[in-house]
Design a protein with these regions (language model features):
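General beta-strand structural signal in soluble alpha/beta enzymes
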Residues: 23, 109, 135-139, 165-168, ...
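Conserved phosphate/anionic-ligand binding catalytic regions in large, soluble enzymes, centered on
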Residues: 21-36, 137-159
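Short, Lys/Arg-enriched N-terminal segments with co-localized hydrophobic residues
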Residues: 9-15
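Mobile "lid/hinge" segments at catalytic clefts and subdomain interfaces of large enzymes
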Residues: 44, 161-257
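Buried hydrophobic packing segments
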Residues: 34-39, 149-156, 190, 213-220
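Glycine/charged-rich beta-loop-alpha catalytic/anionic-binding loops adjacent to active sites
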Residues: 15-20, 127-138, 172, 195-201
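Glycine-rich nucleotide/cofactor/substrate-binding loop typically near the N-terminus or early
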Residues: 40-128, 187-200, 204-207, 211-214, ...
């Protein structure tokens, strides 16, 4: 009888445990990879994903993204297929906050989205030697970054993890092309945001971690380090648009109980 009672107690205790997220990034992380992995962990369909996107309230984002199966080196995962009109808008942080505030996103998702863009704005202000109010986002102010950040925030807050654990981030040298011309990897905004973040070098070239993704990780309170002791409940593999020949590709997402 005692054994039966203990088993029931253990099951009830497991059910009451709040789930956490573990993220491992052997080849880096980008905003679209965050969106993809979190969508898989949250178990949302493409129809549900479209509803989240529409809740942002930006007409150009309507019907712009689906999550599809994708494989690299015959290892299957998922990838976000994103189709957006080309823009030349250089948005200020205030304009982005106004978009978020006017959206129909849940309050928690709005707050997380704005924290991510605030971290990014502070980094850009440092890089360009101006005030946060004077920052004009280029790539990060484009529709895809608003999409990645807001949808990832909606999915993350829907899961509502007790803890968020992330591996140290891979870094490499190389050249990145952007609106400012040729930049060294990591790009300046990432360089500024890396303070306090554990990293390690990899045998590759180019951009492994995007500014949008790093700002989101910091805004979401990611704890960088080794695997925590946990029990895996579900997992997903998210691919980005870049394939590294010398690295294991994809980011691995895990829903766990601690």
């Amino acid at each position: 009888m005692w054994c039966h009672s203990d088993t029931q107690h253990d099951r009830k205790e497991t059910q009451l445990k709040r789930q956490s997220i573990v993220l491992r990034t052997p080849s880096g992380i980008s905003g679209d990879m965050l969106l993809t992995g979190l969508a898989q962990l949250a178990g949302v369909s493409n129809a549900e994903l479209s509803a989240i996107v529409d809740s942002i309230g930006v007409d150009a984002l309507h019907d712009c993204v689906t999550i599809e199966p994708h494989h690299v080196n015959w290892i299957t995962g998922h990838q976000a297929r994103i189709s957006l009109p080309h823009e030349h808008h250089h948005r200020t942080p205030k304009l982005i906050y106004d978009i978020i505030d006017a959206s129909a996103l849940p309050h928690a998702a709005k707050d997380l989205s704005k924290r991510a863009f605030a971290i990014l704005a502070e980094a850009e202000a440092t890089v360009h030697g101006c005030s946060v109010e004077e920052v004009h986002f280029h790539e990060v102010g484009a529709l895809d970054s608003i999409l990645d950040t807001c949808v990832a925030a909606a999915l993350f807050t829907r899961i509502d993890p007790a803890e968020f654990h992330c591996s140290p981030l891979p870094m490499c040298d190389g050249i990145i092309r952007c609106e400012h011309g040729l930049l060294a990897s990591p790009p300046p905004a990432v360089q500024d945001m890396l303070t306090g973040v554990p990293v390690y070098g990899v045998d590759a070239s180019g951009e492994t971690v995007t500014p949008t993704a790093l700002a989101f990780l910091k805004a979401a309170g990611a704890r960088f380090g080794k695997w925590p002791q946990c029990e895996v409940v579900a997992s997903a593999r998210a691919y980005g648009g870049k394939v590294f020949e010398t690295l294991p590709n994809g980011a691995n997402f895990f829903l766990v109980t601690m």
